[in-house]
Amino acid sequence: MIRHRPFGSGHPYAVDTEQRSPVDPVAGEPLVLGVRTSAEVESVVLEWERDGVAEAPVALERVPRSSRGQVVDGGHLASAQARLARASGGWRVTLDDLVADERIRYRFTGDGGGRAQSTRWFETTVARWTASGVGPAVDGVDRVVAGSVHRLVRGDETLRVRFALPLAPGERVVGFGERFDTLDHRGLALDSAVFEQYKSQGAHRRTYLPMPFAHVVGGVGWGFHVRTSRRVWFDVGASTPDALVVEAETGPDGELALGLYDGDPRTVLRRFLDEVGRPEELPDWVFRLWASGNEWNTQAEVMRQAELHREHDVPLGSIVIEAWSDESTFTTWRDARAKVADGAEPRRLADFEFPEHGAWPDPKGMVDELHRRDVRLVLWQIPLIKMRPHPAGQVKADADAAIRDGVLIREEAPDGTLRPYRNRGWWFPLGLMPDLTDERAAHWWTEKRRYLVEEIGVDGFKTDGGEHAWGRELVYLDGRRGDEKNNVFPVHYAKAFGDLMRRSGKAPVTFSRAGFTGSQAHGTFWAGDENSTWEAFRWSLYAGLNAASSGIVYWGWDLAGFSGDVPTAELYLRSAAAAAFVPIMQYHSEFNHHRTPSRDRTPWNIAERSGDERVLPVFRRFAQLRERLVPYLAEEARRAVTAGEPLMRPLFFDAPHAHEAFAHPFQWMLGDALLVAPVVEEGAGSVRAWLPDGEWVDAFRGTRHTGGVVERDVPIDEAAVWIRADAVDRFAGVFV
């Protein structure tokens, strides 16, 4: 076997062994060509031509087997990612001195085992960067730096546009969607690619939910939106301190639109949301405590956990069940029995028999009982048809119907024909992917789940995944390619399930981790997979503040992390104190193969594991406080949605010129009346907080303060929260 894939897998941050890099060769830059071979191949030679003239064959060098991707924490998600990340070795060659516009034709021949094997011939043309007098189409006051526009062209096609925007001394740049590493991005470089980075997003500086939008604050006040769904790179003063350099992929015509907005952060965000879609007000119950654990995978366990919340007097608003399904169709409850049906047909509750001793003997009865307890139920989803191991039964019928009915994203086969795209990511590899950007396909997909809402009574869906569309060459049902549509897939994924909820007469509650520009209008979000560490705690708060700056209203994170061993009692309680004052308060834990001791993030398990008797009463105190805050949160969310403002608001929204707003990056306003300053360092017993101008009242102690820096000791059972003095009456009976 000898294989070369010019585009590779489409992984945005890695070069595959068998790909061409860069995919589009550029004059003056080295071009690396790689192949992967079977073990018997002993040598590989590149045959190639330049503008039809044969060049001397070049021998490839062997690439050693990589050790990257080794499993370090034993989790099933880590194992899956590691299997994909490990490279099996291959061959590569580097070509230099490429000339603009020359056509390169090449193939590879490998020898070994007594025979030669060759790939087919591949062709590409060398692109070049050239200065251009035509920049992006600007809507607003034109800030594009004169002479900064360049285009990457190949023949008559434009591949990318690069230009610069000015940065004045003292200006800060905030936003870009959900970003984990910092609040002010000046001095850094980043890009806008939807990507599933399993844990440590802040260290890798990658995100599930990017947006090519940001605020520039601290000067005259402005913001920008690169109006594209294609990938964009931002050099935010990293290379040139006084310039924000933007490089964007384009279509062949080279057109690119740029929105520039003058004004304070509220004005900038409002204008951005007017373009891309305002958030929709969701029911009050989303502000109550969300609880889940991946090992809550039976009806008995779900009800046991619900009962434990009641027994320990911890208010519970909703339960998220991840491992509820057969793990193949994601429409059928595990252990349920049903005849194999046409995969296009919506299921009905009457289709299923639920064995008395199965995992879910009466899912409808379970949901009814939860509703009687005023607890909502959210079910997990993934936008894939599982194809490994080889499908059988209902999942095979589903796959056959999806192919027959033409509802899948496709890719080009080597012979140029189109075939169903097979997931190239590490999670559910080779799965089929419905084109949820297409209304017909989205309806086809979600109707199969309608019985869960209308007959079982489910209140929402955890729309997990959404990052599985890899490759610019993918073909969507409207004919557009992956370079243009992969990023917006998760937006349509959440919309599709929100539309299902609406059709069924319920609020469009979805709980997503992936998204892009336009996600603001679709449901709630959490910050994805993270470890139980103090560093991850801080990364998650940065993520929430950047997401809020980009217009996400309903956001939370797995408080104290979900992966690895349980958090310390201190981390758990400090995280709970912070989570009580963000839009979504929820805890969750990763699958641990049901090993003991349990890694559940319930307060009673953390209390047992840590041996710290403070855990349960302190968590209870914050959960009960959260319950009393729900009316305030609902009212402030309504105002935020109407006004186009964040609910969890970084301080620069109120004081864009104040240095202190960035000197205290982990503070925020929750609505108009509460200022929150969490403890985010291990062993810290106090915080140094900054209060904007005005009168403030300590929420827990009643002491009054004027604006400025305040030092406050923070016992483990308190949070550093201040109320605007003119709003104290709104919190009568809340902080008790």
Regions found by a protein language model. Give the residues of each.
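Generic beta-strand/beta-sheet core signal
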Residues: R227, S292, G317-W324, P355, ...
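Aromatic-lined carbohydrate-binding/catalytic grooves of carbohydrate-active enzymes
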Residues: E280-G460, G465-D478
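Gly/Pro-rich turn-and-neighbor structural signature
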Residues: S292, T298-R304, L308-E311, K364, ...
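Glycan-association/targeting regions that enable binding to alpha-glucans and other polysaccharides
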Residues: M1-L167
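Beta-sheet entry/capping signal
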Residues: S43, F108, V173, P212-F213, ...
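Flexible loop/turn segments at secondary-structure boundaries
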Residues: W222, R231-F234, E295-Q299, S325-T331, ...
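Catalytic core of carbohydrate-active enzymes
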Residues: G498-L500, A507-V509, G515-W526, W539-S540, ...
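Catalytic and substrate-binding clefts that recognize carbohydrates or anionic sugar/phosphate headgroups
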Residues: G110-V286, G293-E295, Q299, A306-E311, ...
